[in-house]
C-alpha cells in the first residue's frame, strides 16, 4: 500500500510506516496529479484540494483529512469515482473551546467586560459549539444557541433564531461548517444585514471558516463602532488575509484555534484508525503528544491559570508582526497542551 501524507501532520510517521509499504511526505500545497497517480490513499489537511483535477485517473481509493472540516474535498466527485473519504469530527473541539475561553478572559482583563453579566450567542452547536457552551456556562455567561439543522431535526425549543442572537447577545461566536449553497448555506452568514442588526458594542468571534463572515461587512462594523472588538482565527482568502482587519481585531491568529497537541493527536489517530478500517489492517499503535515542560500551574485565580496554559495573544502578536508568514506560523506551531495535561493549584 502506498500512502501520500501531508508532511505537517504530527505524530504520524512511526505509525504510518508500520502500516504502509511506501509513504511519501509532501507539503499540503504540493499534492499533484502525478504524485498521487499510483497512490492507494491520501492523508491530508485543509490545504490540499481533492477534486477531479487532482484525482482523475489515479489509483486512490481512500482519503483521510486530519481536520474537522471537509470543504476541501469534492465529495460529489469522490462518490462518482468510488473514493471513500473521512474527516475527524470533534478531534480538536476541546482545543477550540480552550482558545475561546482564553479569549473571553482577555476581553475581561483588557476591556473590563464582566463575563457573568454577558450573554453569548453560539452559532453552530456541534462538537465544538457544545464544548464552547459548556465553557461559557462554567464562567457564568448566559448562553443562547443557534443551529438551524439541529433545530429542525430535533424539533427543539432550545434554539434561538440568528436574528434574536444578533439583537440580544454581547458576544457571538461561530462554529459552523462552510456550506456555499443549499438550505443551510453558511457562506457569508454574517453579512452587512447581520451586522446592522447587532446589539451595539458586541464582540464577534470566528474559529470556523473565514468565508462564514463577509470581510468588508465585518470591517465596516468595526469602523463604525457597531462592533467593539473581534477575535478572528479564520479568514477569507487564507493565507492572503486582509491586513486592515488584522490590525483592527483584538486577537488575530493564523487558523490555529484547534492546534493543541491534544487535538492534533486526536486527528492523526482518527485518520489512521479510518485508514486501517478501510484496508482491514490491525494495529494497536497509540499516539500521545509530548508532555509540557512545566506541568504544575500554581496561581491566584483560574483565569490566570488558563492564560498561563494558553494565551492567544502570543499567536496574535506573531501574526500581526509577520502577516506574510501565515502558513509558516501554522506549519511550525509550537507545542500547546490542553488543561488536562497540567496540575492546577489555585492559591487564593
Swiss-Prot record:
Positions of substrate binding: 46, 67, 259
Catalysed conversion reaction: 4-phospho-D-erythronate + NAD(+) = (R)-3-hydroxy-2-oxo-4-phosphooxybutanoate + NADH + H(+)
Family: Belongs to the D-isomer specific 2-hydroxyacid dehydrogenase family. PdxB subfamily.
Protein's name according to its UniProt entry: Erythronate-4-phosphate dehydrogenase
Gene Ontology CC entries for this record: cytosol
GO biological process: pyridoxine biosynthetic process
Subunit and partners: Homodimer.
Pathway(s) where this gene product acts: Cofactor biosynthesis; pyridoxine 5'-phosphate biosynthesis; pyridoxine 5'-phosphate from D-erythrose 4-phosphate: step 2/5
Tagged with keyword Mitochondrion: no
Major enzyme class: oxidoreductase
Known function: Catalyzes the oxidation of erythronate-4-phosphate to 3-hydroxy-2-oxo-4-phosphonooxybutanoate.
Organism of this sequence: Bacteroides fragilis (strain ATCC 25285 / DSM 2151 / CCUG 4856 / JCM 11019 / LMG 10263 / NCTC 9343 / Onslow / VPI 2553 / EN-2)
Xref: InterPro entries: D-isomer_2-hydroxyacid_DH, D-isomer_2_OHA_DH_cat_dom, D-isomer_DH_CS, D-isomer_DH_NAD-bd, Erythronate-4-P_DHase, Erythronate-4-P_DHase_dimer, NAD(P)-bd_dom_sf, PdxB_dimer_sf
Coiled coil: none
Amino acid at each position: 500500500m502506498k500512502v501520500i501524507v501531508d508532511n505537517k501532520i504530527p505524530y504520524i510517521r512511526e505509525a504510518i510506516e508500520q502500516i504502509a509499504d511506501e509513504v511519501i511526505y509532501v507539503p499540503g500545497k504540493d499534492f499533484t496529479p502525478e504524485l498521487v497517480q499510483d497512490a492507494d490513499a491520501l492523508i491530508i489537511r485543509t490545504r490540499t484540494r481533492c477534486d477531479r483535477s487532482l484525482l482523475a485517473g489515479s489509483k486512490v481509493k481512500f482519503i483521510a483529512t486530519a481536520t474537522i472540516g471537509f470543504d476541501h474535498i469534492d465529495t460529489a466527485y469522490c462518490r462518482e469515482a468510488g473514493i471513500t473519504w473521512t474527516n475527524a469530527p470533534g478531534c480538536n473541539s476541546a482545543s477550540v473551546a480552550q482558545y475561546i475561553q482564553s479569549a473571553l478572559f482577555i476581553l475581561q482583563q483588557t476591556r473590563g467586560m464582566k463575563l457573568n453579566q454577558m450573554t453569548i450567542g453560539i452559532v453552530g452547536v456541534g462538537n465544538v459549539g457544545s464544548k464552547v457552551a459548556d465553557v461559557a456556562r462554567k464562567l457564568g455567561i448566559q448562553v443562547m444557541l443557534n443551529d438551524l439543522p439541529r433545530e429542525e431535526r430535533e424539533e427543539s425549543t432550545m434554539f434561538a433564531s440568528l436574528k434574536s442572537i444578533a439583537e440580544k447577545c454581547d458576544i457571538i461566536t461561530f462554529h459552523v461548517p462552510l456550506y456555499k449553497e443549499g438550505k443551510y448555506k453558511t457562506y457569508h452568514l454574517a453579512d452587512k444585514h447581520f451586522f446592522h442588526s447587532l446589539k451595539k458594542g458586541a464582540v464577534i468571534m470566528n474559529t470556523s471558516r473565514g468565508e462564514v463572515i463577509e470581510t468588508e461587512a465585518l470591517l465596516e462594523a468595526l469602523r463604525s463602532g457597531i462592533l467593539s472588538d473581534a477575535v478572528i482565527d479564520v479568514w477569507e482568502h487564507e493565507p492572503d488575509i486582509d491586513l486592515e482587519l488584522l490590525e483592527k481585531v483584538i486577537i488575530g491568529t493564523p487558523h490555529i484555534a484547534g492546534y493543541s497537541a491534544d487535538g492534533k493527536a486526536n486527528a492523526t489517530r482518527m485518520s489512521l484508525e479510518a485508514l486501517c478500517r478501510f484496508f482491514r489492517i490491525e494495529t494497536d499503535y497509540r499516539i500521545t503528544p509530548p508532555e509540557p515542560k512545566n506541568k504544575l500551574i500554581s496561581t491566584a485565580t483560574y483565569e490566570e491559570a488558563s492564560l498561563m496554559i494558553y494565551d492567544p495573544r502570543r499567536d496574535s502578536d506573531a501574526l500581526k508582526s509577520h502577516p506574510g508568514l501565515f502558513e509558516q506560523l501554522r506549519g511550525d506551531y509550537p507545542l500547546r497542551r490542553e488543561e488536562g495535561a497540567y496540575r492546577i493549584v489555585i492559591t487564593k
